[in-house]
Design a protein with these regions (language model features):
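Rossmann-like NAD(P)(H) cofactor-binding subdomain of soluble oxidoreductases
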Residues: 33, 41-101
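Internal alpha-helical scaffold of NAD(P)-dependent oxidoreductase catalytic cores
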Residues: 12, 81-90, 97-193, 220-227, ...
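Alpha-helix C-terminal capping/helix-to-coil transition sites in glycosyltransferase folds
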Residues: 29-30, 62, 107
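NAD(P)+-binding Rossmann beta1-loop-alpha1 motif at the extreme N-terminus of oxidoreductases
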Residues: 1-33
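Structural motif
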Residues: 33-37, 112
Length: 243
């Protein structure tokens, strides 16, 4: 989802896409900075498939700045920076919805740029190239990775919370969920997003981002020996809601 939005913002940039008309790879190699927007498919208990990402990084010459926007686990960017010490890495997570991806990219609610020691000298320049946002932060690579992971995990939890409240209210047959919802979401600590019961005709959460980010976080927690009971419950409830 991310590549076309980046292309629309950087109108004079070289672009390379094996599935669409684009510049040649040799033309792209003239650039000093590469925004890498590639799919990282996720399989439960196996992790993200980083092969296409790693292949692309291998083909970018030393000394270049590489800004990754693909979805990955916390710690992945530090692994890349250590593996390729002569390249400079940044992580700029996407916060897009499928229905309004281009608008979300051009008018983000936050702009987060994760940097390494090797890329820190270009941090301000790159940040100013990106669409402005009310919250603009330059942080470590791993903190930027966690911001993306936390947001999406919270959204999944919020969806399930509102679905559970809906079911409880419906059982009473006295109160109106939509009236109640439309009032409480005016509390800025709660907000309107992810409070509607049906999305695209189904309950629960689906799509390309939320499920895989939740599942990957649960698997990540298991690997580091952390308790993820709440997240596992969210996953379990969603499996019977999402029909």
């Amino acid at each position: 989802m991310v590549g076309s939005q980046v292309k629309s913002w950087f109108k004079n940039a070289f672009t390379y896409d094996t599935n669409k008309q684009s510049n040649t790879w040799d033309e792209c190699l003239k650039a000093d900075c590469f925004f890498v927007c590639l799919p990282t498919l996720y399989k439960e208990n196996e992790g993200y498939d980083l092969s296409i990402l790693e292949e692309t990084i291998d083909n970018i010459p030393d000394g270049k700045l590489i800004v990754i926007r693909s979805t990955i686990n916390p710690g992945t960017m530090d692994i890349f920076q250590n593996r390729y010490p002569k390249k400079k890495f940044m992580f700029n997570p996407e916060f897009l919805t499928e229905l309004s991806a281009e608008e979300d990219f051009k008018h983000p609610d936050m702009q987060i740029l994760g940097i390494s020691k090797e890329s820190s000298g270009m941090a301000t320049e790159i940040m100013l190239m990106l669409p402005p946002a009310p919250e603009m932060r330059i942080v470590s690579l791993i903190d930027a990775e966690w911001v993306k992971k936390l947001r999406n995990a919270f959204y999944t939890t919020k969806v399930i919370f509102f679905n559970q409240i809906y079911d409880i209210i419906e059982k009473t047959e006295l109160a109106d969920y939509e009236t109640i919802r439309s009032i409480v979401v005016h509390d800025p600590r709660i907000g309107n997003s992810h409070s509607f019961i049906k999305h695209k005709g189904y309950r629960g959460f689906g799509g390309a981002c939320l499920p895989k980010d939740l599942y990957s976080l649960i698997d990540f927690a298991k690997k580091v020996g952390a308790n993820s009971e709440l997240l596992e419950t969210v996953k379990k409830i969603n499996k019977y809601l999402y029909k």
